[in-house]
Swiss-Prot record:
Type I collagen is a member of group I collagen (fibrillar forming collagen). Residues 987-997 have a biased composition (Pro residues). InterPro entries: Collagen, Collagen_superfamily. Belongs to the fibrillar collagen family. Residues 43-69, 140-169, 194-208, 235-250, 324-340, 497-514, 568-612, 619-639, 657-670, 687-697, 751-778, 786-799, 846-868, 877-897 have a biased composition (Low complexity). Residues 70-84, 640-649, 901-912 have a biased composition (Basic and acidic residues). This is Collagen alpha-2(I) chain. Pfam families: Collagen. Expressed in bones.
Length: 1015
């Protein structure tokens, strides 16, 4: 027991046990001998270094010296070098949907695009035939190829602030955000409450004797010869039962178990959730032309529409298809060529005529984006398309945010192991003191991936993500069924004026009508002075006058010179609707006027009837992951998931300073051993004594039966951040989990900067003519547009060859001019008059006031089809016409051919930071991993802090009253818990509410052979 301290001698290496010996535990505890006197330390003169001798046998460990004084605080170390950049981790799991972000502000108006390219001249039209009956509404034809995008125009004036739009459908969940920077070290928190009683840990490995107190280090002396162990002391009296030791550290994992027997074949699992959409497949080759489909059944009669508002002036119609050939009549005698007649009146509107489709026009400038339309009814699922080729692996995503700390789980009671064979009794060991905590074990390997947990509850929709790159153009979807056309929407905003288009070819010369009787020569009047326009009086507009009786149509006067342009007068009130007048002879076609000012947008029309559900299109390519939104509100607790695999062992926290040890009390004299008394009541736990000498390690005892798990301990305080560990190896990409159901559609993010225009796409092949579609309901009439500015007079074309005389048309309607005073009645008994000489060309009069708009006349009876006239000479192209007003909205055409992918757009501005999310659910505790093999004994670690207080031991005899020790220092904060595992994806939420009705764009419709085109 006395003698020198041999703790500085090298210890023999500990042999690694195979873990197969089983005994009934260590032998009975030996009696503690009396404490020997402290060994005298001496320092010999420094000798010359000798040859390294062989390692002698290990001497007995001497008793522990008195504890040294607490060392002074050391100087803070130099800041470490910045760590190397870590390897990009695998793509994190999909984060919880964040809370919906606040609606963004309305963006400023974009630049007006440049005028579109000048269109090519159309092909010459076909000879006009008789107007056929209107055909049934055709299907939507394939759209023309997309035109090249114009460069950005100058910034337009800032328009008035529009009304706040209704909230759009919720956005897709954002992708996990990047890992935040390290925050500053927080102040140490207050001490937490005492945790519940912990489980009894495995006995720790005896640690080395603590370092001596702070003192000047002496010169190393010559290694002396190992001393002989002293004689064994006289056994002392039986000591009192000590308090239960502190909870030991968790032992190293045991060796891997042997492979178990094959289990029974399980029942077939239920069908997994729908997988995520596959990547966009490559554009397939053009398939062969399909067979002509049979005519579908006649659709149900449409609902009777209400009378619509007055429509906008329609665009110029295209040349109709030549009508059916009439029955051949008897050849008449050749007539004498008559003089050139006046231009005939326009023909009556044909009933259900079918025009040939014209050449595809150039794409106009892109209109403004309309509001979100009403969501359609879920379409019927279309046929499953062929599986596309496997896409390239995506980029590794950002690591997901760190999950919250999971609540401690309650493990189930394990099965009791088989009792091992009885081991040989070990030698009596000295009663060793509790050693310091052992070294950190080797990190366990990655466990196998556990089965997918049940789907969680639907999370809240995340905030709108930043605008991602434009996705690859999707494949063309299957044509949906034609729904009933909705009513025409409100008139869209006026687009920028396009360039003047090329003049179309001169149409065929119409049939000549009979020459009317020339009128009497009028007296040439002197042009009066142009009066200034009068201002509108304060009174209200007068009542509309009644329409006068139809006058006798006068002879066609010669074209007068262009008069001075009068100032625009105030708009008069609409006159009462007059009786339908007779159709007048058409005047010469005026030049197309310049485009008028855009009128104010009319009120939104009522929502149309819900269309029939379209067929479901093919699944588009998955977009890139957005950034992670803030955590959403806590959902309902999910079902208990299956137990996950055991995670890697966490790093040890920074060891806190050891508190001062209290002064030892005086030892009392040893009394004579008395007779063994009865077991006394349990006394209070004694103070922790000085650490005794470490005894020799006995043989390992048998494995005890695993006891029931104790109650979960309280959550520890968050400790200081540990030093950065070494960079670990790149983990293998885990298996792709089952795709969760699609989430809500996210809110519309801010529009990104416009990308550069891609090259113009090539025209797609001409599609097959479809079967005639269902006749749609008539749309509501749009509001009347503002009158356009009068156009310049065009150059007269060359005179065409006169055609044969046509049938005489009905008398024309009264012109807009003021009715002349009735002339004096002529004599009825006079001779018949002769044709007078042609009158002199009169000067052009001033523009008359605009009369009220007359109602459309009733369609007249069908005239007989006249013989076709000869083709006239091709006229000179007239002046460029201005763009007509936007027509009513036609139904949406099918998707066009896949265009060339555009360049990547510029990144949008960073959105505002989202609201902080609520704390998520805690993960479940994983199963303990298999015990690993014992590692080699590590080097002694530093003295750790005192372990937690163990449970109360059995009652011992009453101890003597000791002196009160000094109060201990505040212990360090605990190590932060490990990160919880990512929970499974939640199930698909309910569909979002329908959005507001969208504004309809412009366009005009024309049908052909049952196909419905939209311009």
């Amino acid at each position: 027991s006395g003698g020198f301290d041999f703790s500085f001698l090298p210890q023999p290496p500990q042999e690694k046990g195979d873990g197969k010996g089983v005994g009934l535990g260590p032998g009975p505890m030996g009696l503690m001998g009396p404490r020997g006197p402290p060994g005298a330390s001496f320092q010999g003169p420094a000798g010359e270094p000798g040859e390294p001798g062989q390692t002698g046998p290990a001497g007995a460990r001497g008793p522990a010296g008195p504890p040294g004084k607490a060392g002074e605080d050391g100087h803070p170390g130099k800041p470490g070098r910045p760590g190397e950049r870590g390897v990009v981790g695998p793509q994190g799991a999909r984060g919880f949907p964040g809370t919906p972000g606040l609606p963004g502000f309305k963006g400023i108006r974009g630049h007006n695009g440049l005028d579109g390219l000048k269109g090519q001249a159309g092909a010459p039209g076909v000879k006009t035939g008789a107007r056929g009956l209107p055909g049934e509404r055709g299907r939507v034809g394939a759209p023309g190829p997309a035109g090249a995008r114009g460069s950005d125009g100058s910034v337009g004036p800032v328009g008035p602030a529009g009304p706040i739009g209704s909230a759009g459908p919720p956005g897709f969940p954002g992708a996990p955000g990047p890992k935040g920077e390290l925050g500053p070290v927080g102040n140490p928190g207050p001490a937490g409450p005492a945790g519940p009683r912990g489980e009894q840990g495995l006995p720790g490995v005896s640690g080395p004797v603590g370092p001596p107190g702070k003192g000047a280090a002496g010169l190393p002396g010559v290694a002396g010869a190992p001393g002989l162990p002293g004689p064994r002391g006289i056994p002392g009296p039986v000591g009192a039962v000590g308090a239960t030791g502190a909870r030991g550290l968790v032992g190293e994992p045991g060796p891997a178990g042997s492979k178990g027997e094959s289990g029974n074949k399980g029942e077939p699992g239920s069908a997994g959730p729908q997988g995520p959409p596959g990547p966009s497949g490559e554009e397939g080759k053009r398939g062969p032309s399909g067979e002509s489909g049979s005519t579908g059944p006649t659709g149900p009669p449409g609902l009777r529409g209400g009378p619509g508002s007055r429509g906008l002036p329609g665009a110029d119609g295209r040349a109709g298809v030549m009508g059916p050939a009439g029955s051949r009549g008897a050849s008449g005698p050749a007539g004498v060529r008559g003089p050139s007649g006046d231009t005939g009146r326009p023909g009556e509107p044909g009933l259900m005529g079918r025009g040939l489709p014209g050449s595809p026009g150039n794409t106009g400038p892109a209109g403004k984006e309309g509001p979100v339309g009403l969501p359609g009814i879920d379409g019927r699922p279309g046929p499953v398309g062929p599986a596309g080729p496997r896409g390239e692996a995506g980029n590794i995503g950002f690591p997901g945010p760190k999950g919250p700390t999971g609540d401690p789980g309650k493990g189930e009671k394990g099965h009791a192991g088989l009792a091992g064979n009885r081991g040989a009794p070990g030698p009596d060991g000295n009663n060793g003191a509790q050693g310091p905590p052992g070294l950190q074990g080797v990190q366990g390997g990655k466990g196998e991936q556990g089965p997918a947990g049940p789907p969680g509850f639907q999370g809240l929709p995340g905030p709108s993500g930043t605008t991602g790159e434009a996705g690859k153009p999707g494949e063309r979807g299957i044509h949906g069924e034609f729904g009933l056309p909705g009513p025409a929407g409100p008139r869209g905003e006026r687009g920028p004026p396009g360039e003047s288009g090329a003049a179309g070819p001169v149409g065929p010369i119409g049939s000549r009508g009979p020459s009317g009787p020339p009128g009497p020569d009028g007296n040439k009047g002197e042009p009066g002075v142009v009066g200034a326009p009068g201002t509108a009086g304060p009174g209200s507009g007068g009542l509309p006058g009644e329409r006068g009786a139809a006058g006798i149509p006068g002879g066609k006067g010669e074209k007068g010179e262009t008069g001075l342009r009068g100032e625009v007068g105030t708009t008069g009130r609409d006159g009462a609707r007059g009786a339908p007048g007779a159709v007048g002879a058409p005047g010469p076609a005026g030049a197309t006027g310049d485009r008028g000012e855009a009128g104010a947008a009319g009120p939104a029309g009522p929502a149309g009837p819900r269309g029939s559900p379209g067929e479901r299109g093919e699944v588009g390519p998955a977009g890139p992951n957005g950034f992670a939104g803030p955590a959403g509100a806590a959902g309902q607790p999910g079902a208990k998931g299956e137990r996950g695999t055991k995670g890697p062992k966490g790093e040890n926290g920074i060891v806190g300073p050891t508190g001062p040890v209290g002064a030892a009390g005086p030892s009392g004299p040893n009394g004579a051993p008395g007779p063994a008394g009865g077991r006394g009541d349990g006394g209070p736990p004694g103070l922790t004594g000085f650490p005794g000498a470490a005894g020799r390690t006995g043989p390992p005892g048998p494995s005890g039966i695993t006891g029931p798990p104790g109650p979960p301990g309280a959550a520890g305080k968050e400790g200081l951040r540990g030093p950065r560990g070494d960079q670990g190896p790149v983990g293998r990409t885990g298996e792709t989990g089952a795709g969760g159901p699609p989430g809500f559609a996210g809110e519309k993010g801010p529009s990104g900067e416009p990308g550069t225009a891609g090259p113009p796409g090539t025209a797609g092949p001409q599609g097959l003519l479809g079967a005639p579609g269902i006749l749609g309901l008539p749309g509501s009439r749009g509001e009347r547009g503002l009158p356009g500015v009068a156009g310049a007079v065009g150059e007269p074309g060359p005179l065409g060859i006169s055609g044969p005389p046509g049938a005489r048309g009905p008398p024309g309607a009264v012109g807009p001019g003021v009715n002349g005073a009735p002339g004096e009645a002529g004599r009825s008994d006079g001779p018949p008059g002769r044709d007078g000489l042609p009158g002199h060309k009169g000067e052009r009069g001033y523009a008359g006031n605009a009369g009220p708009v007359g109602a459309a006349g009733a369609p007249g009876p069908h005239g007989t089809v006249g013989p076709a006239g000869k083709h006239g000479n091709r006229g000179e192209p007239g002046p460029a016409g201005s763009v007509g007003p936007v027509g009513a909205v036609g139904p949406r055409g099918p998707s066009g051919p896949q265009g060339v992918r555009g360049d990547k757009g510029e990144a949008g501005d960073k959105g505002p930071r989202g609201l902080p999310g609520l704390k998520g659910h805690n993960g479940l505790q994983g199963l303990p991993g298999l015990a690993g093999q014992h590692g080699d004994q590590g080097s002694p670690g530093p003295v750790g802090p005192a372990g937690p207080r163990g449970p109360a031991g059995p009652s011992g005899p009453a101890g003597k009253d000791g002196r009160t020790g000094h109060p201990g220092a505040v212990g360090p904060a605990g190590v932060r818990g490990s990160q919880g595992s990512q929970g499974p994806s939640g199930p698909a939420g309910p569909p979002g509410p329908p959005g507001p009705p969208g504004a309809s764009g412009g366009g005009y419709d024309f049908g052909y052979e049952g196909d419905f085109y939209r311009a």
